[in-house]
Amino acid sequence: MTSMETYQRADPLLGTALEGRYRVDAVIATGGMSTVYRGLDTRLDRPVALKVMDSRYSGDVQFLTRFQREAKAVARLKGDGLVAVYDQGGGAPGDEPPFLVMELVDGGTLRELLRERGPMPPHAVAAVLTPICKGLAVAHAAGLVHRDVKPENVLISDDGEVKIADFGLVRAVAEAGITSTSVILGTAAYLSPEQVGSGDSDPRSDVYAVGILAYELLTGRTPFTGDTALSVAYQRMDNDVPPPSSAIAGVPAQFDALIRRATDRDPAGRFADAAELGDALAEVIDELGLPAFRVPAPKQSAQHRAATAFHSGVLQDGSTDRHPNVGTADVRPPDPRRDTRVFTPDELPLPLEPLPDETEYQPATGQFAGIDLEHFHWARQRSKRVLAGWVVIVLILAGLLAMGAWTLGNNLPNLV
């Protein structure tokens, strides 16, 4: 029996209905703070994502108060680049564990895309960062700070939408005074110096994290490494983030400058918030004449595998009846106190269902920064700076030259 099959069958929440309404169908991923499930709102017949917090948070009044407050605040946010929050519940002593009901994004995470394809060319990086900045800008305008911007919290839909999730959870956990090594390991690479030094954070802390994320998208790695999460975190206290062009050839100077300002060790030197960062990014896109781009969802994502497991009838009792005796959950979830992980294709007991054909993609040849261009979708619109046909030819030639410099000048396997 595979570990995936064993886990799906052993999880006591599978097949139950949280608060008698939200059916728990399949595990998507598990981490230090929570387990994420594919589920169904049986009242509205709507697929949802269920983030069930670790059982150690149940009964913690301080955590539950903050958890409920943050959930209500995030649920009021509306805008592109944000994963919608529909409901929250649980957490009372003897009750179900605390949980969030969120929009189910059919696709995968930015982390999974990076693992599949490696570092991205500038136009793809811009396409990822633009909706992230828009989503964060909406939150910052409402007085909210994410505090945990990282590839695992960026979702990419099969339709090419990029959205950020998990607002407010870090603050709720921190104020509850409950920490774990796995939580620290999951965030250390993206923490701002002030978060490491004093624990303080504001919109500029999110800006710093986006700068680190931009560096990683361009180079395939984060700027600071170390043997422990603590050593990784403290490196940013005394060291500036190096320009990405020093790690991989072909990065435009405009991206070096953007990341340098976003990751200034002094918060006063950074962009004030995500809106200001987004405006600066738009100027870079315009100056470089970067084409619009449809971000591809990862092919082998945990979300896709969870959907396959559910639709194939893989349940804790091994039956083909997907929801026998669905009732309220009165059991605690499995203890997920370990590093966040998702299941690999080999762990799935049944073959993956084929994904829809990407007929809208326009095949091309070659690679750019380790990414097969044949998988990319180039929008059929010209850049505002393209005023005549000969400019298009110049841009194509420049892109081919950059592709050659990026591919030949780097040992891409070492960057993943």
What are these regions (language model features)?
Residues 1, 308-416:
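C-terminal or otherwise distal, non-catalytic regulatory regions appended to signaling enzyme catalytic cores
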